[in-house]
Amino acid sequence: GCTSVIDHHASPAYIGGSLSTLRDAFLKVGLRAMTCFETTDRNNGIKELQEGVEENIRFARLIDEAKKATSEPYLVEAHIGAHAPFTVPDAGLEMLREAVKATGRGLHIHAAEDLYDVSYSHHWYGKDLLARLAQFDLIDSKTLVAHGLYLSKDDITLLNQRDAFLVHNARSNMNNHVGYNHHLSDIRNLALGTDGIGSDMFEEMKFAFFKHRD
């Protein structure tokens, strides 16, 4: 079974304190985890962006204090979450840059899951997705990018040069009918994930393999 969870959490009606609730659950059942809140403006604009960043920072600092106290098992870690580039304006990316710098954590973001994400970035910012994130110092060896189906060759080169990670989510891509990532062999640091569609990684491996053979 699963012993570890990497989580990209969203609860727009419950932002502040939500990651602590998750941590309590992980500690209760004894699972290792790394979690974050997916910063976005898609429900409540700039206020939601600010609250999401604040929750990520608060939780990272809570983890730092918990590690020093050693009164609880060290099972849960933090990273800095963002939903997707098309729901995080430059003001939000600047907040995330400061959060990454302040906490020493990496960014966890879904990018290029659909072609729209890329088109939006080109239309509004005139940049490829990861090039835009890199402008805010958000692509490094601690960065986790989910999906990446429509990353450009330049973005893939950037991802590899910065030693960042890409997570392939075969069943989620099939379920959302977004296509297939044909550049997996070009990725240096590649991992397999589920995007929350299940917890059976052996099943995920089977789908990833057979879809690749399709």
Predicted regions mapped to residue ranges:
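Short acidic/polar active-site loop segments enriched in Thr and Asp
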Residues: 3-4
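A conserved active-site cap/scaffold subdomain adjacent to cofactor or substrate pockets
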Residues: 150-188, 192-193
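Short, basic, glycine/proline-bearing loop/turn elements
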Residues: 7, 82, 141, 163-170
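Conserved short loop/turn motifs at secondary-structure junctions
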Residues: 8-15, 81-85, 174
